[in-house]
Amino acid sequence: MAIDPHKDVDGFHPTNFGKMALDMESFIPATPYGIMELLRRYQIDISGKHAVVIGRSHIVGRPMSILLSRKSSPGNATVTLTHSRTKNLTALTKEADIVVSALGVPNFLKEDMVKEGAIIIDVGITRVPDASHPKGYIITGDVDYEHVKEKASFITPVPGGVGPMTIAMLLQNTYLAYSRHADI
């Protein structure tokens, strides 16, 4: 790895990933960190809830599963980490109290895939061609937002949901790196 773990504000260095997994002080990847901050600030209790994370990337899926299951607040969820080879994904998401989708497939998560009152976190962000839009495209998430929002107790929009929180937590990590270096 080229970057020093003490300067790894993205939280991707294996040292930081390992420390995060062991619940030690480390830089946490910005997107999962932002999602946890959303849950904390909106006072969403996830303790004892079943969370399904769709996507097993090192950037979102795996760190998200670790943070959701941590013995902390928010945390203490029972987590199922799914991926492209998961069988019966719909059966899992229909039983989930929390669904975090980090797949990158526009409008993948449909209304019939979630239960009433579920907490839906949409991490996906895809440019979808749209000739009627001035830019020629629209930004779409993994969740069929307009239909799923009717069933969800909490849902993040795309754009404007997880993305701004990712930026905020990246800045938080940057400040933390500076304060450690400056001994503030």
Model features per residue range: what roles?
Residues M1-G18, I121-D183:
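Rossmann-fold NAD(P)-binding glycine/threonine-rich loop
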Residues G18, M24-I119, V128, G136-I138, ...:
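Glycine-rich phosphate/diphosphate-binding loop of Rossmann-like nucleotide-binding domains
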